[in-house]
């Protein structure tokens, strides 16, 4: 069997590796002409996200992630108002990407290969690429992310729904923080919640993947409301005057918005978290959208990860959902050699998983950004793919 995976990010790599492991001949087609770097910051490293690297690649968790043992909340003065025991693991997009990609044969990963379309028959799918070449395969896995070309073609009525807020993000070297700040944030994911907003900070591996204290990065995610229209358009207009759709990458956020963000941090956030925000040199931002799909399987073609459901980050489960989709896909293909039948069986469970995760992250987001009833220590807020802590 031959398969093409469109999209060379974490979801696409999981799909390619797991299909490869059951004997499928797989090629990954990534539209970016350059190696994917700086495409993400910190990620919650749930068991599903780590499973392939631990079970199949034998990579020790402590080599690719940072463990924290506390969930901590600070008030405006920087005093601890909640400090509960709970173990999380955090990694970085780059660390996980490098580890997964190292498991795939280099000749199977094709940069600068954008899919322009496909034509399907009962027996195969012909994938068309921008280079005017084509590939004939038995299975097409579309893992092309939030702005999925495949989703737009297969489900043209599905549109991103703006959640009403944006995530400001950034990372700073742990070693650049003063001792008091490091102590306040030590061994924890640290939150501050205030009216219609919240921010969290946690340690992740350093730029070279180091997990040694002092060589790591401190990552923050700050959710801030922007009215659709002028306010949102303004913050998404980059330093070159271009209005972005989904995110503004590091180094491209307009200087006036960076200055405003730092000013609000200094005026409104607890000092330890504010110092992290102020020291970040190249903050970036992503718009928070909901995307829900009614289908994920279309004959010999499927949507996987963010190409299907796009969920808010509050469960730290976006990467885990893509990995779970990939594991289930490989298991379905291994059980059933008829690809359309396998995809039909695979689809029902993944649709249910995506729908419950989307609804749960909507509820969590509403609690902080709209209703103001986010309670520190509430077990419903624990990260997890299938439910709090699950």
PLM regions and their residue ranges:
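Helical substrate-recognition/capping region of FAD-dependent monooxygenase/halogenase enzymes
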Residues: 1-2, 233-250, 258-263, 331, ...
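FAD-dinucleotide binding site
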Residues: 4, 23-28, 32-38, 42-44, ...
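Conserved mid-domain beta->alpha element of the FAD-binding
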Residues: 5-21, 25, 32, 141-142, ...
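Short, well-ordered alpha-helix to beta-strand connector turns
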Residues: 23, 68, 106-107, 137-138, ...
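Active-site-adjacent segment of FAD-dependent monooxygenases/related oxidoreductases
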Residues: 32-104, 368
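Conserved FAD-binding catalytic core of PHBH/FMO-like flavoproteins
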Residues: 59, 79-80, 87, 98-258, ...
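Short acidic alpha-helical/loop segments enriched in Asp/Glu that coordinate divalent cations
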Residues: 232-237, 272-283
